[in-house]
C-alpha cells in the first residue's frame, strides 16, 4: 500500500480498547498517522474507512525487542532480510521491531551501525530501531557509544558473557561498559551465561563422543546461567547502572532476578517465546534435523516446569518483556554442525508467531489477563525504549500502530503457511486462539483478513532518546540520596614513617627492639650458611652447672608402671 498515511482516515468502531492498565469500550479514530480520538459517539470527518471491531479487542501494535534480520552469525546468514522479516511481524500483529548490530572485534561500532541502516532503510515495512553490540572494549569504543547515543538515535547496547574468544567480555570490561552506559543514559542488555565453563563443558561433551544437538543442553546447564546472572547484577549494582537481562531461560536465573528485585536492585528482564512455551526434550529427538531446529542459547530446558514458571514470571512482572529473538536458519545451514554441535548456528524463528503463542499459553492458559498481555508484548518495551506513550498505548496523540485482535478466532501454525523465513516452525501444528484480523502501521492498513498490503521501505527508523524514566528516574534519585562521601576530619600532623626499601612494598621503619637480619642474597631462598643460629660459642645459659642426666619423678600425665 503506497498511499501516504496523511491521506488515510480510519474509524475502528465497536471494539474494546485494551491498554496495559485498563480495558474499556470505545471507538478509535485515526488520521495523519496519529490516533486522534478515542471514545464513544465521535464526531469525525467523512470519507473514513470504517473497520467493524464488534466483539474484538483493539490493542497497541506489538513491539518485538529482539530480532536479527539480515545478520550473519556463526558463518551463516539469517534467511529473513528486513523486508520479509518485518512483513512477517506485521502479519503476526507486531508493528515495531528492534534489530541487532553486531560488530566484529576491533571494528567500528558506528560503521557497523551505518551498514545495518543501509540494509534496513530500503526494506522495512514497519518502524524499527537498533541495539548495538559491544563485542570488545577500548577507549575508542566508549567514544563511539557516546556518538551513537548523541547523534544516531541508539539508546541500548548488548553485551555477552558467553561466546568465548568471539564476543565475550571479561568482568572488568563489563564493569567499564556498564559505567559508560550509566554515564550516557543507555540501557545495558546482557546475555548471561558463564562463557568459560560453557567452553569447558563443550570440550568435555565432545570428548565423550557427544556431537548431536543434545550437546547444547548438556554443555550449558542452567546453573551457568544463574551464576552469570547473579554476577552481572552484582557488577551493575556496583556501577549504579540499570541492567537488562535477555533470553532468560531457566528457573534458577528467574529466581536470581526475583531476589534482586526484592532487594531493590534495578533489574529488568526479557525471555523469549520459545523459552516461555517449549522444552529441551526436542534436543533428544531421533531426527537430527528436528533436534537441530531448536538450537538456541541459552538452550531450552529439560525441566518441563520451566516454561510454565517463566510464563508466571512474565505475569507477575519479574520478567518484563517477551521477545521472539527471531534468527531463523534453514536445515541445510544448521547441518554445518552435523558432526559437531558447537558449529550448529544458534537461532530460531518466531517473529510472526510471538503474539498468538503468548496469547494462547498466557491468556487462554490462565496465566495473565489481556492487560498484562499488552504490557509484555508492547507497552513495557515502549517504556524501556523511551517511546511511551507515543507507542504501546491507545490514546489520542499516539502513533497509529494498532491491531484489531480476535480473541476467539483460531489458527493452526505450520511452516507450510508461514510468512517468516525458514523451512521449520517450532510450533508446528499448535492451535492458537487469538488472531490479528487487522494490523495498522503508521496509520495505514497493512494487513487485513489474510491479505498483506504494504511495500518495502515504507517503515521508518525511530531514534530513541537516552535516560528512559522507567529505569533511570529512580537511579538518579538514589545517587542524590545515597551518594558516597568521605569523612571530614582534622588533618593528621604527626610523623610519617619512612619507606625502608624504595621501589618495593612499603613497610614501616622497624622499632629499635625489633630483631632484624640482612636481606638474603639468593632470590628469596634462605642460605643456611648465613643463619644467625649457632650451636658453638658462648650461650646465654653457660653459667648454669650441667648434669649428665636428670630423673623425672612426675612426668606430665602422671606416673606409669613399667612393663618390662
From Swiss-Prot:
<dbReference type="Pfam" id="PF01979">
    <property type="entry name" value="Amidohydro_1"/>
</dbReference>
<comment type="function">
    <text>Involved in the negative regulation of dendrite outgrowth.</text>
</comment>
<feature type="modified residue" description="Phosphothreonine">
    <location>
        <position position="514"/>
    </location>
</feature>
<dbReference type="GO" id="GO:0043025">
    <property type="term" value="C:neuronal cell body"/>
</dbReference>
<comment type="subunit">
    <text>Homotetramer, and heterotetramer with other DPYS-like proteins. Interacts with DPYSL2, DPYSL3 and DPYSL4. Interacts with MAP2 and TUBB3.</text>
</comment>
<keyword id="KW-0597">Phosphoprotein</keyword>
<feature type="modified residue" description="Omega-N-methylarginine">
    <location>
        <position position="559"/>
    </location>
</feature>
<dbReference type="GO" id="GO:0007411">
    <property type="term" value="P:axon guidance"/>
</dbReference>
<dbReference type="GO" id="GO:0007165">
    <property type="term" value="P:signal transduction"/>
</dbReference>
<feature type="modified residue" description="Phosphoserine">
    <location>
        <position position="538"/>
    </location>
</feature>
<feature type="modified residue" description="Phosphothreonine">
    <location>
        <position position="509"/>
    </location>
</feature>
<keyword id="KW-0225">Disease variant</keyword>
<dbReference type="InterPro" id="IPR006680">
    <property type="entry name" value="Amidohydro-rel"/>
</dbReference>
<dbReference type="GO" id="GO:0016812">
    <property type="term" value="F:hydrolase activity, acting on carbon-nitrogen (but not peptide) bonds, in cyclic amides"/>
</dbReference>
<comment type="similarity">
    <text>Belongs to the metallo-dependent hydrolases superfamily. Hydantoinase/dihydropyrimidinase family.</text>
</comment>
<dbReference type="InterPro" id="IPR050378">
    <property type="entry name" value="Metallo-dep_Hydrolases_sf"/>
</dbReference>
<dbReference type="InterPro" id="IPR032466">
    <property type="entry name" value="Metal_Hydrolase"/>
</dbReference>
<dbReference type="GO" id="GO:0030425">
    <property type="term" value="C:dendrite"/>
</dbReference>
<keyword id="KW-0963">Cytoplasm</keyword>
<dbReference type="GO" id="GO:0005829">
    <property type="term" value="C:cytosol"/>
</dbReference>
<dbReference type="GO" id="GO:0050774">
    <property type="term" value="P:negative regulation of dendrite morphogenesis"/>
</dbReference>
<dbReference type="GO" id="GO:0032991">
    <property type="term" value="C:protein-containing complex"/>
</dbReference>
<dbReference type="InterPro" id="IPR011778">
    <property type="entry name" value="Hydantoinase/dihydroPyrase"/>
</dbReference>
<keyword id="KW-0488">Methylation</keyword>
<feature type="modified residue" description="Phosphoserine">
    <location>
        <position position="532"/>
    </location>
</feature>
<dbReference type="GO" id="GO:0098978">
    <property type="term" value="C:glutamatergic synapse"/>
</dbReference>
<dbReference type="InterPro" id="IPR011059">
    <property type="entry name" value="Metal-dep_hydrolase_composite"/>
</dbReference>
<protein>
    <recommendedName>
        <fullName>Dihydropyrimidinase-related protein 5</fullName>
    </recommendedName>
</protein>
<dbReference type="GO" id="GO:0007399">
    <property type="term" value="P:nervous system development"/>
</dbReference>
